[in-house]
């Protein structure tokens, strides 16, 4: 399969390495055009992948059957919009990022958009990407358009298992959003690993109650209890992980909070609902972000 991976960070390099090893015709795409990208990944089994892979080849992009978007949520709109005229109409676009709300920012177009939520974890250590935790990737459309692309799910599963197809991914996206609304701001606020947020059970319950109330208004059957159970399971299973938002704060990068808690607050506002706990955490993270962005020269640009 001919694939372009947009964004060559930790997750992008992980997918590039895995797809290349399955003999797919894959390239990366960088914001600043370069002829190749040095992909250095240490796999879960300790083996290393070190290759210079092609990047930013417009002919490859035009012929691509899949654009796999591995950017931060706030980078997606401008980057994908710039590439839309350069893609063939049959090219599917799979968005793999934390949070929700990016597709609404894109111009109307004819492409099939798919969303993915993943529990794979990778981190950067210098010039090397370390695959620190295997996981599950769920993909599918968020619209009511009937698409059945188990073949794509199977292709991706062969490269980086497990991958499952959903005819409507929306519920899975909201579940992941609930987890992110708890783990990301709390780890960012308290500068701790995922497991350490278990010290704040009452706060976690209040956050889950607010998320559940919005999900109910959005048409998803859930409860505070079921959401709390799910979130706590994820906290325990990822206890040693450092959240992406905390990594961003420590590196003084722009975070994805506007597409995590920010998205939740926007949906709540549309239903006339107030979410005091989530709103408080959102403001605290934005304050941390603005402290260093005011000193720096605007948003970091590399992806």
From Swiss-Prot:
Q: In which pathway does it act?
A: Cofactor biosynthesis; (R)-pantothenate biosynthesis; (R)-pantoate from 3-methyl-2-oxobutanoate: step 2/2
Active site, UniProt feature:
176
GO cellular component annotations, sorted alphabetically? cytoplasm
Q: Which domain of life is it from?
A: Bacteria
| UniProt binding sites for substrate | 98, 180, 184, 194, 244
- In this chain, NADP(+) is annotated as bound at 7-12, 98, 122, 256
Output this protein's name: 2-dehydropantoate 2-reductase
NADP: is it a keyword of this entry? yes
> According to the UniProt record, which cysteines are disulfide-bonded?
none
| Family of this protein | Belongs to the ketopantoate reductase family.
